[in-house]
């Protein structure tokens, strides 16, 4: 079965797909966002599109106390999207998770252009999963 090139797929889906969110920015400028699962920065562009690129990276929360899921797509099973995702759960502290994400994204020239976006998404998700410390409240000593 012949595969369709990513450039052609992007030309077909860039203006009309179910993940597209169009909003007005400042003035009359339209801003287009994307709700794709494999889009790290949620911007409607060819570089970040999970539909048009064969190699995609996704970082999601696994649950409250379960850590972060790092997903990369296999390039061989493009016609079976559910089977084409490698998922690994990261449960360590942030510094180790950031090393793993950086190595996975840049390793073997997978998608080195997405390293900064992947680390930013990991940082945002890990901050959201962090639990606030409970302890005695500090009192103001000026009273």
From Swiss-Prot:
Source domain of life: Eukaryota
Key word Oxidoreductase present: no
Keyword Ribosomal protein in annotation: yes
GO cellular component term of the entry, any: cytosolic large ribosomal subunit
InterPro entries attached to this UniProt entry: Ribosomal_eL28, Ribosomal_eL28/Mak16
Pfam families: Ribosomal_L28e (PF01778)
A GO MF term: structural constituent of ribosome
Keywords, ordered alphabetically: Ribonucleoprotein, Ribosomal protein
One BP term from GO: translation
UniProt similarity note: Belongs to the eukaryotic ribosomal protein eL28 family.
Name by which UniProt lists this protein: Large ribosomal subunit protein eL28y
Organism: Arabidopsis thaliana
Lineage per the UniProt record: Eukaryota, Viridiplantae, Streptophyta, Embryophyta, Tracheophyta
């Amino acid at each position: 079965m012949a595969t369709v090139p990513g450039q052609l797929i992007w030309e077909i889906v860039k203006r009309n797909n179910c993940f597209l969110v169009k909003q007005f920015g400042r003035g009359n400028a339209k801003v287009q966002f994307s709700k794709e699962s494999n889009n790290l920065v949620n911007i409607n562009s060819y570089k970040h599109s999970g539909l048009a690129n064969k190699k995609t990276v996704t970082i999601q929360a696994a649950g409250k106390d379960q850590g972060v899921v790092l997903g990369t797509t296999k390039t061989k099973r493009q016609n079976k999207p559910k089977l084409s995702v490698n998922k690994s759960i990261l449960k360590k502290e942030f510094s180790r998770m950031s090393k793993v994400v950086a190595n996975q994204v840049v390793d073997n020239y997978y998608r080195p252009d997405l390293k900064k976006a992947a680390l930013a998404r990991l940082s945002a998700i890990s901050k959201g999963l962090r639990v606030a410390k409970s302890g005695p409240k500090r009192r103001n000593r000026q009273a």
